[in-house]
């Protein structure tokens, strides 16, 4: 049994809280759509919706379904996704990294500090899970080494990915640093099975950078 992480393979607890709520709408059909994107050029997904639109709950559901730390079949066997042809193929087959960017932004004094803290926290959990394979503090090198040694791909879930553009709306240099990090982390990386990002702002270009030019 894997030890659950805060960011790496966080398990099913957050999603189970949603399931136990008085009002729960089964949106597991989303999983069939994301399953179809895995291993394709469309594996990078960005969902822009207003607050309170259920974006975080959807990310919790995806983390529970894809994450390999907990057998979540007992949960999903009861949901609509269980009838999909791809259901068993991807259930609990991936290492999941789930991040809420707002959490890191709120306790950071700059973009540089935020990105350093994010890497430190995630890589620390990667080292605990894969002590024999992670030799670097750089998140890209760490994940690439894990993939090279184990063949295991990652599903990366990022909530509030666009919070930087609200906080640093007039700081183009900060925006550029952030987008450069996202791109270097995710673009053309063999370890990425699926990247699913949620935000509030509409997708657009910031300066000369395309926010989702993956």
Where in this protein do the model-derived segments appear?
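Phosphate-binding site recognition
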Residues: 1-214
């Amino acid at each position: 049994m894997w030890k659950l992480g805060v960011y790496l393979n966080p398990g099913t607890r957050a999603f189970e809280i949603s399931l136990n709520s008085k009002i729960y709408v089964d949106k597991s059909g989303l999983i069939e759509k994301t399953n179809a994107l895995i291993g394709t050029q469309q594996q990078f997904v960005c969902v822009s919706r207003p607050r309170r639109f259920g974006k975080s709950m959807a990310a919790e559901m995806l983390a529970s379904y894809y994450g390999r730390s907990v057998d979540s079949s007992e949960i999903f066997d009861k949901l609509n996704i269980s009838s999909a042809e791809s259901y068993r193929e991807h259930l609990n087959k991936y290492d999941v990294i789930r991040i809420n960017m707002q959490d890191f932004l709120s306790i950071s004094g700059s973009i540089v500090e935020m990105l350093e803290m994010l890497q430190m926290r995630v890589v620390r959990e990667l080292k605990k899970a894969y002590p024999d394979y992670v030799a670097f503090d750089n998140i890209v090198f760490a994940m690439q080494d894990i993939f090279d040694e184990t063949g295991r791909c990652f599903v990366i879930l990022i909530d509030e990915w666009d919070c930087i553009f609200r906080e640093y709306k007039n700081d183009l240099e900060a925006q550029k640093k952030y987008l450069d990090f996202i791109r270097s982390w995710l673009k053309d990386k063999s370890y990425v099975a699926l990247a699913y990002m949620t935000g509030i702002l509409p997708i657009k270009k910031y300066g000369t950078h395309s926010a989702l030019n993956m």
